[in-house]
């Protein structure tokens, strides 16, 4: 069975036997590559998240897993604590700024060490590009990472992956 998500102008739907509504007002960035009512597989959504920083995909996937962004953030906090990341508090799945959203380099190292135990993690986050297949409304398209360490423009010995991000408030 395939999990799919659908994004429209007023909300998003994830279906896996049932449909759940995602409140897009929780997204402070506009959707990156998804179109109104476009259906993507979970794998396509994760590639969009990892390569194109598709914050809309992060939120939709979170709702599909936990029912709401808040519930998913709570699960993230619980898992972080289990891993010993005690100076971390998440409020969203996409990392966009929030005064109650914080972590430390040590905690992120703990979380990353656990993520690296999953072989699919590097498949998604170590990819420099992905050919997204055609969807119900869009032709096939290329996602290309702008991270200079992933696309080969710069190098760092031993680097397995890296994730960049940018917001106005982070300047």
Language-model-derived ranges and their functions:
Residues 1, 45, 49-66, 72-76, ...:
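Alpha-helical scaffold elements that line and support the substrate/ligand-binding pocket
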Residues 1-15, 20, 108:
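Active-site SXXK
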Residues 22-24, 36-38, 63-65, 94:
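A mature extracytoplasmic/lumenal domain signature
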């Amino acid at each position: 069975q395939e999990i799919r998500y659908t994004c429209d102008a007023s909300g998003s739907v994830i279906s896996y036997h049932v449909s759940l509504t995602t409140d897009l007002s929780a997204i402070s960035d506009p959707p990156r590559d998804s179109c109104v009512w476009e259906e993507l597989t979970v794998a396509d959504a994760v590639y969009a998240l990892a390569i194109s920083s598709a914050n809309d995909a992060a939120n939709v996937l979170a709702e599909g897993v936990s029912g709401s962004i808040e519930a998913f953030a709570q699960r993230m906090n619980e898992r972080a604590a289990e891993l010993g990341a005690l100076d971390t508090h998440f409020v969203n799945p996409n990392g966009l700024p929030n005064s109650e959203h914080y972590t430390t380099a040590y905690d992120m190292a703990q979380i990353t060490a656990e993520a690296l135990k999953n072989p699919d993690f590097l498949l998604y986050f170590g990819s420099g590009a992905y050919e997204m297949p055609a969807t119900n409304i869009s032709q096939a398209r290329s996602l290309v990472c702008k991270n200079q360490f992933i696309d080969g423009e710069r190098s760092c010995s031993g680097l397995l992956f890296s994730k960049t991000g940018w917001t106005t408030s982070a300047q």
